[in-house]
Amino acid sequence: MVRLGRPGRQTGEVRILSIQSSVAYGHVGNSAAVFPLQRIGHEVWPVHTVLFSNHTGYGAWRGPVVAAADVREVILGMEERGALAQVDLVLSGYQGSPEIAAVVLDAVERVKAANGSASYACDPVMGNADSGCFVDPAIPPLLREQVVPRADVITPNQFELGSLTGLLQDSARPRIAEILDAADAARAMGPSTVLVTSVAHADQPEDTIE
């Protein structure tokens, strides 16, 4: 087992700074990401952006958005321990406020300044086809204009890909070629890799998802 602060690491281990939500009920954000990544051998350092009872797609929830200043303090404390220079990947998900988004981007800059080979993977959480948009209305344009252009990898679902690019708006089940065109449009925004999740397209049976 590799311990925080020790110089050695296991073969293939990636050290991940995961800045995401945490929920008590269900599995999203850090509540979904941390254990699986640890289980396959990676070192994950979670920083929570919200502490919610459940994810906001339910329409009602309780618990606080962590103040952006507090998220920043946690990251600065890690920087003071020399941890940011060890980070290989910054992973971000649900961003509870525009202020937290700014803190995430600052963390990405700090990590890349300390480790020039580090990457940033952004899950641009905005909503889904069933629930529509369930984030602060200020978040989608911020993701589109500031966050996604600075990401190396993005992992939108089909709804989020359409929201980012303005494409895929006319059909709930577009052709696969249209989805690939939207992914190309997203790559043109900045990230080199676009991984689209929860795809439902016209070329597949209606009772399946990809």
How should these model regions be labeled?
Residues 1-2, 14, 37, 158-162, ...:
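Intrinsic structural disorder
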Residues 2-122, 126-129:
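Conserved N-terminal subdomain of the carbohydrate kinase-like
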Residues 133-210:
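Conserved phosphate/ATP/ADP-binding segment of small-molecule kinases
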